[in-house]
Swiss-Prot record:
This protein's record includes keyword 4Fe-4S: yes
Cofactors, names only: [4Fe-4S] cluster
Catalytic activity, reaction form: iminosuccinate + dihydroxyacetone phosphate = quinolinate + phosphate + 2 H2O + H(+)
Name of the protein in its database record: Quinolinate synthase
Family according to the record: Belongs to the quinolinate synthase family. Type 1 subfamily.
Keywords attached to this entry: 4Fe-4S, Cytoplasm, Iron, Iron-sulfur, Metal-binding, Pyridine nucleotide biosynthesis, Transferase
Annotated HAMAP family: NadA_type1 (MF_00567)
Length: 353
């Protein structure tokens, strides 16, 4: 096992030990009432990622916040008048919010909630890798630390990655892609670009297997298969729709199918069911069941976000995201490059994990 794999394994284990505890309905209602009062008192708005606990997603909507992907969460915070953003998600999402909203206080229920893609792309090793291939344009996925973004030429989300890499390919540029090898491989195959892949992956999406998906499809032959491109190639090849979180949600709403097999984090079901309550959603099978599966289609770091630590941080202000000014300025350059690219082509930039 490599040093990076060791780090991911240890962090994953720690995350499972600190997952938010289950609450009784009475406890949940009490905490929600406290949080609603604190949000007003602290001039704060709650933004939650699609993969967080449905209780948090519902609370964000009830209190005038939003449920979205990480970039849309940050942009919502930029447009909202609140002076404090409470970000329910994982750390790189809080950093992205801070990069785009430097004048605001950005809090998270816990700063320990990270991501296997982030852990799997440490800036020192990644920078050395880039230096070894200095003739290549560096493209990084939004699911990375501020430090890795600062080393990049472009930041991309899964919904715009194909367009940007195709643009670079047409310009004759060779590319370094990081960190997700599956998404990178998908983009490479679709565009034909010369792409050198960093060896990273999402522990949730890597668990989906084509054999289990094929077996499930036999049980539900009329179901459309929706797959996030962070999944292995064999799973992606079985998809009726390959897309970002937002694109998969829109597919459930717009497609005529009554049943959908969904290969992404199960937290997304809250929004899918809200948008299309008449549709039947089926979890795509992971590599195992119960104690034998690694993620069981739910990110252990997302599960660290809960009502209790959310309430506690609104009181203590201790879990604040800090991005140093010089790092923020460097990380903003490739991020802004993506936003400008999107604006020039009048595209909607949504859909990192």
């Amino acid at each position: 096992m490599s040093a990076i794999s060791d780090r991911i394994f240890v962090q994953e284990h720690l995350a499972r030990e600190h997952e938010a505890s289950e609450l009784s309905p009475e406890e949940a209602e009490r905490l929600k009432a406290e949080i609603k009062e604190l949000l007003v008192q602290e001039d704060a708005v709650l933004v939650a990622h699609y993969y967080t606990d449905p209780l948090l997603q519902a609370l964000a909507e009830e209190t005038g916040g939003c449920v979205a992907d990480s970039l849309e969460m940050a942009r919502f915070g930029n447009q909202h008048p609140a002076s404090t953003l409470m970000v329910c998600g994982v750390r790189f999402m809080g950093e992205t919010a801070k990069i785009l909203n430097p004048e605001k206080t950005v809090l998270m229920p816990t700063l320990e909630a990270t991501c296997s893609l982030d852990i799997g792309c440490p800036v020192e090793e990644f920078s050395a890798f880039c230096d070894e291939h200095s003739d290549r344009t560096v493209v990084v996925y939004a699911n990375t630390s501020a430090a890795v973004k600062a080393r990049a030429d472009w930041v991309v989300t899964s919904s715009i990655a194909l367009d940007i890499v195709e643009y670079l390919h047409e310009r004759g540029e060779k590319i370094i892609w990081a960190p997700d090898k599956h998404l990178g491989g998908y983009v490479k195959n679709k565009t034909g670009a010369d792409v050198l892949l960093w060896d990273g992956s999402c522990i949730v999406h890597e668990e989906f297997k084509s054999k289990g998906l094929s077996d499930l499809k036999q049980l539900y032959p009329d179901a459309a298969v929706l797959v996030h491109p962070e999944s292995p190639e064999a799973v992606v090849e079985m998809a009726d729709v390959v897309g970002s979180t937002s694109q998969l949600i829109n597919a459930v709403k717009s497609m005529s199918n009554e049943q959908f097999i969904v290969a992404t984090d199960a937290g997304i079901f809250y929004k899918m069911q809200q948008m299309a309550p008449e549709k039947t959603l089926i979890e795509a099978p992971t590599a195992g069941n119960g104690a034998t599966c690694r993620s069981c289609a739910h990110c252990p770091w997302m599960a660290m976000n809960g009502l209790e630590n959310l309430r506690d941080v609104l009181i203590s202000k201790r879990q604040e995201i800090i991005v140093e000014a010089d790092l923020r300025e460097k990380a903003l350059i490739p991020l802004q490059r993506m936003l400008n690219f999107s604006k020039e082509r009048q595209m909607a930039v949504k859909g990192n994990a």
